[in-house]
């Protein structure tokens, strides 16, 4: 059985026991979360929501939090000899899917 969920503005295809990296969630590492924005549940019988399935949920465990690689943003203006350098690191959360209900 698999499900397509939405979290952080992105969609993920998950199965029981799978580990995925999503946008940062406000939950402690080791805690259990419920993702209720389920778009589709597939398996022997496929159910599709419009846009979400009512009563469907995916239970997952927060494995850990981390930060992605540093992205450098460089802006330069001609004639002024002006430039600006900024860096950014995106926060993420790794979760492990425990069960799919729906």
UniProtKB/Swiss-Prot annotation:
The keyword rRNA-binding applies. The keyword RNA-binding applies. Signal peptide: none annotated. It comes from the Bacteria. GO terms for biological process: translation. GO terms for cellular component: cytoplasm; ribonucleoprotein complex; ribosome. Pfam families: Ribosomal_L21p. Keywords: Ribonucleoprotein, Ribosomal protein, RNA-binding, rRNA-binding. One of its GO terms (molecular function) is structural constituent of ribosome. SUPFAM superfamilies: L21p-like. This protein binds to 23S rRNA in the presence of protein L20. Belongs to the bacterial ribosomal protein bL21 family. HAMAP family: Ribosomal_bL21. Part of the 50S ribosomal subunit. Contacts protein L20. This is Large ribosomal subunit protein bL21. It comes from Desulfovibrio desulfuricans (strain ATCC 27774 / DSM 6949 / MB). The gene is rplU.
């Amino acid at each position: 059985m698999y499900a397509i969920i939405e979290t952080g503005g992105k969609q993920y295809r998950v199965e029981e026991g799978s580990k995925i990296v999503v946008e940062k969630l406000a939950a402690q590492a080791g805690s259990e979360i419920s993702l209720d924005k389920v778009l589709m549940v597939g398996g022997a019988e496929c159910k599709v929501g419009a846009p979400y399935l009512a009563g469907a949920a995916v239970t997952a465990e927060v494995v850990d939090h981390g930060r992605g690689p540093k992205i450098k943003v460089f802006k330069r203006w001609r004639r002024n000899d002006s430039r600006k350098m900024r860096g950014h690191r995106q926060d993420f959360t790794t979760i492990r899917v425990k069960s799919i209900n729906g």
